[in-house]
Amino acid sequence: MKLILSSCDFGNPTSARFISDNLCKPISDCKVLYFPNEKVTPEKIKSGKYEARVAAFGFQRNNIYVANYYDPTPFFNLDIDVIYISGGNTFGTLKLIRDSGFDKAIVDYVQKGVIYIGGSAGAHIATADISHVAKYDKDTFGLTDFSGLGLYKGILVCHYTEDRKADFDALNFLGNYRVVSLRDDQSIVIKDE
C-alpha cells in the first residue's frame, strides 16, 4: 500500500514534483482513476472538463478515467496505477464516495497496490477520522459517520499555518490518533499502514 498525501497536490510545484517522484512509473504512463469533488454533475463528467484538468498535470488523456458517482459499476475493476482525489469539501466528497459504493472499491484498489494520491479533502478522506475538518469545511452534508477510509490510521491538519497550531496541539493532546500537519508545500508518503 502506498499513499501520497498533501495539502495542495498538483496545485503546488513542490508537491507536484514530490507526487511525480513517488509514482511507480512516469506520470505520463500512469493510468489514473480521478474522483471529482462535491461540485460534480453528470454534465461535468461528460464534458471532458475533468480529463483536461488531470491531463494538465502530466497524465495522458487516454489513461484518465473519471469516476462517475451516478453509474459507478464500470469503475470497480479497472486496470489502473493511481487513484486521485483532490480538494473540495471533505464531507461532500466522502458522501458521494460512500453513497456510490466507491469507498469499498478504493480500499480494495489500494490494498491491491494502486497508489492513492490525496490532496486536501482527498488526503483527509484517506485517514481514520475527518470530524476535526468540520472547523474548516462548515457544511458536513448530513454525514453522521465521520470515519474516513482508514487507509492511514492517523489524521491530518492540511493547510497548516500558525493559525492552525492550536487545533493541531489540541488534537495531539486528545491522543486519539497520530496527527500530522501539512503546510501547502508539504507532502508525505505512507506505506503499508
Regions inferred by a protein language model and the residue ranges of each:
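N-terminal beta1-alpha1 cap of cysteine-dependent amidohydrolase-like domains
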Residues: 1-82
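Short, flexible loop segments at the rims of nucleotide/cofactor-binding pockets, characterized by
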Residues: 8-12, 61-65, 93-96, 135, ...
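A generic structural signal for short coil/turn motifs at secondary-structure boundaries
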Residues: 41-43, 92-95
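Active-site-adjacent pocket-lining segments in enzyme domains
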Residues: 85-86, 94-115, 122-193
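Structural signal for conserved beta-strand scaffold positions within catalytic alpha/beta enzyme cores
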Residues: 5, 34, 66, 118, ...
